[in-house]
Amino acid sequence: MNLMEINACILEELMDKKIILCVNVKGYFQELDKKYHVLNRVAFVVDNYDRKQGYTECEGYRFPVYSFDYLNNINIDDYLILITSEYYEEVYRQIKGMFPDHINTTIYHYADARIHYYNYFSNKFKEKPLENKIIFCSGAKKAYNIESGEFDDNSLALFEYMLENKLNMTYQLVWVVLHPEKYTQKYSQYENVYFLPYRWSESKDTNERRTYYENICLAKYFFFTQATDIATHRREGQIRVQLWHGQGIKSRALFTHDEYRYEYMTVMSEKYGDLHAEIFGLRQDQILVTGNPKQDWLYHPLDKRIFDVLGIPKADKYVFWLPTMRDSKTEVLSDDSINSDTGLSILEDECQLDRVNEQLRQSNMVLVIKRHPFEKCNTHMVKTYSNIVILDNTMLSDRNIHINRLLGYADALISDYSSAAIDYMLLDRPIAFAIPDLDAYKSSRKLHFDNLGEWLPGIQITTESQFCDFIKEVRDGVDSGKKLRQNAFKKLGKWRDDNNCKRVLEALHII
């Protein structure tokens, strides 16, 4: 077998053959049809993910979607097999592994604009040595045009650590973002720091395209939090590191086999290393047990004057609540849906919030609720309560504030399924888990642990009364969940320090 990029001449030459598309990616189908008008020739689609099988529709066409095993039922020489994925080499390996070595069929792949340009420039720069250049990226795929989280999380923590330790004098530090102008001024005093517009990856301007791919093709290291689309392919010697968002109690919604999508993934402990190797399809030697860079922020919170900027009043004690915020109109429980007038679990109506607010007022305590990034803002909740402050994602992202930069001031934390609770566990302070919908949530989202109570680093609360009791415990300095937290740390944790960034860079021999 061999792999070749499809083009108009090949499609015309093989006009008599029906097409099999691998894999089910509608965006690729649309682009493919716009360029070559071939969807009318498609026989079926193959995809190994169960949730993508069945049928798919695109541009008025409806195709059956089978697993890859279906290819064993046909004579593949009768078809034109066309890979529709940015990870076309990975898909090709899967297909090739299904057939004997003597099969001499050519497998084709469609290259979108970014892949086409990358292939061109990687060939152009292949004789140039790699440079002391590190690329950073954070958040969802830039192709989705989602700004939220694009300059944040573990990638940002590692970047700022490198600046603090003057590693920008050894390496060029380059961020791929949607809007460089938002960040350029803040870091203008640093040498060798650049912000590269993602749009240049498909720019019509030759110089912009060249600049973008010269950085991508010659960088030694890539660090990303979540999406890997800036480095779906690499040349020999380049190292891609998946920092992810952290480790929590919920698993991934969709398994992907990431073994060839990056070289390493960082985790906070051996237990999470085993879990992530399984759910990301990685080898054990790809797991770096270093701790998560953003956990260092817990030990170095921002100047407390930021509370004035965020409208957080002075108090004797602060309890932070990081709920998985939910939409009251959605029936299926997930990361962004729950039946509640307030969008909160447990405190589901304003009367309950009134009672909790009064308890906080009498105790000179403040409850800080940090919204889920995708939750719509209920501004009346912000204005109504004297001792309850609600922070939405925009308030923080506009000021480049990650929640871990504030949690160092939290005397206690209330969470549910967020990885922030596992981060906060390192500070060894009280944690409560507001999970009244546990059974329903498990039916919609897989968790790492079946016997969850044995793994949680804190007590479980399911009612308003228990919520208020936890507030009282914090007020009185009672820590009823201490043993639970200690037991959980023994199983899930490893370090309680601010050296995670350092360990990541040491593991990669950057320092």
Model-derived features: positions:
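Active-site donor-nucleotide binding/catalytic segment of nucleotide-sugar enzymes
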Residues: 122-123, 127-154, 304-376
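Catalytic donor nucleotide-activated moiety binding site of glycosyltransferases and closely related
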Residues: 172-193, 322, 326, 353-396
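Catalytic binding pocket for nucleotide-activated donors in carbohydrate/polymer assembly enzymes
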Residues: 384-386, 392, 417-492
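A nucleotide-sugar donor-handling region in carbohydrate enzymes
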Residues: 249-253, 260-344, 373, 480-487
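Donor nucleotide-activated moiety binding/catalytic core segment of transferases
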Residues: 197-200, 204-219, 373-422
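A donor-sugar binding/catalytic signature common to diverse glycosyltransferases
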Residues: 220-247, 398-445
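Active-site and donor-binding regions of nucleotide-sugar-utilizing enzymes
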Residues: 26-27, 133-300
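Hydrophobic, well-ordered beta-alpha structural blocks that scaffold small-molecule cofactor pockets
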Residues: 1-124
